[in-house]
């Protein structure tokens, strides 16, 4: 043994007050419970079940709100097959496509408005309507007054984007040049919306 090493003190005998009395365990279980340190992640057995129940209830409420949100979103996006319910992924994809279509519609509307303001396009009210023979409706006399074009579907879904300039169901707006008709017929650009 080295002379520099300190001798270890002998442990005190049980029941004898000594210098290490703070390390002794208390005899009372209440004191023992109070003196324990809680480990991170350790769950008290009594409150664990209640905490889990509260967490589960919060999660159920969260899922319910998410499902209600998807249900509301499904009502606002157009979808082809109304016979089946869209999945959440299909609903989100449809919403993204719908928002992009609305953005294009707004951009094109702004372009038409700017063209009208700049005098590039003549408003439809300035064009004289061709006279229809007696007994025929005015829409049959003018090719631009056709109520709908074959092969150009538009969504009849509520809330679907529609142009006020579209000739699908807006009646006769006057004789437009083919370039003006194409510019004003947004339904062909939106791919079925």
Curated annotation (Swiss-Prot):
Biased composition (Low complexity): 128-152
GO biological process: chorionic trophoblast cell development; in utero embryonic development; negative regulation of T-helper 1 cell differentiation; negative regulation of T-helper 17 cell differentiation; negative regulation of T-helper 2 cell differentiation; neuron differentiation; placenta development; positive regulation of T cell migration
Domain bHLH: 50-102
UniProt KW Secreted keyword: no
Keyword Nucleus applies: yes
Subcellular localization(s) per the UniProt record: Nucleus
InterPro entries associated with the record: bHLH_dom (IPR011598), HLH_DNA-bd_sf (IPR036638), MASH1/Ascl1a-like (IPR015660)
Pfam family, one: HLH
Molecular function via GO: bHLH transcription factor binding; DNA-binding transcription activator activity, RNA polymerase II-specific; DNA-binding transcription factor activity, RNA polymerase II-specific; DNA-binding transcription repressor activity, RNA polymerase II-specific; E-box binding; protein dimerization activity; RNA polymerase II transcription regulatory region sequence-specific DNA binding
Gene3D superfamilies for this protein: Helix-loop-helix DNA-binding domain
Region (Disordered): 1-58, 128-177
Tissue: Expressed in placenta.
PROSITE patterns recorded: BHLH
Its biological purpose: Transcription factor. Binds to E-box motifs 5'-CANNTG-3' in the regulatory elements of target genes, probably as a heterodimer with another basic helix-loop-helix (bHLH) protein such as the transcription factor TCF3. May bind both open and closed chromatin, acting as a pioneer transcription factor to allow other factors to bind and activate lineage-specific genes. Required during post-implantation development for the generation of some differentiated trophoblast cell types.
Oligomer and partners: Efficient DNA binding requires dimerization with another basic helix-loop-helix (bHLH) protein. Forms heterodimers with bHLH transcription factor TCF3. May not heterodimerise with bHLH protein HAND1.
Annotated protein name in UniProt: Achaete-scute homolog 2
Naturally occurring in which organism (per UniProt): Bos taurus
């Amino acid at each position: 043994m080295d002379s520099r090493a300190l001798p270890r003190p002998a442990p005190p005998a049980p029941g004898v007050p000594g210098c290490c009395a703070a390390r002794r365990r208390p005899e009372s279980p209440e004191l023992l419970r109070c003196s324990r340190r809680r480990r991170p992640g350790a769950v008290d057995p009594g409150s664990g079940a209640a905490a889990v129940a509260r967490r589960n209830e919060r999660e159920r409420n969260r899922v319910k709100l998410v499902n209600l949100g998807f249900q509301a979103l499904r009502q606002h996006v157009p979808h082809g097959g109304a016979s089946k319910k869209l999945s959440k992924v299909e609903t989100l994809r449809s919403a993204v496509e719908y928002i992009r279509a609305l953005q294009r519609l707004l951009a094109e509307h702004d372009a038409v408005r700017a063209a009208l303001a700049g005098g590039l396009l003549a408003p439809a009210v300035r064009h004289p309507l061709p006279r229809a023979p007696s007994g025929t409706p005015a829409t049959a006399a003018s090719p631009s007054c056709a109520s709908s074009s074959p092969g150009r579907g538009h969504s009849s879904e509520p809330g679907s984007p529609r142009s006020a300039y579209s000739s699908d169901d807006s009646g006769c707006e006057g004789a437009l040049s083919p370039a003006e008709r194409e510019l004003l017929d947004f339904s062909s650009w939106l791919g079925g919306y």
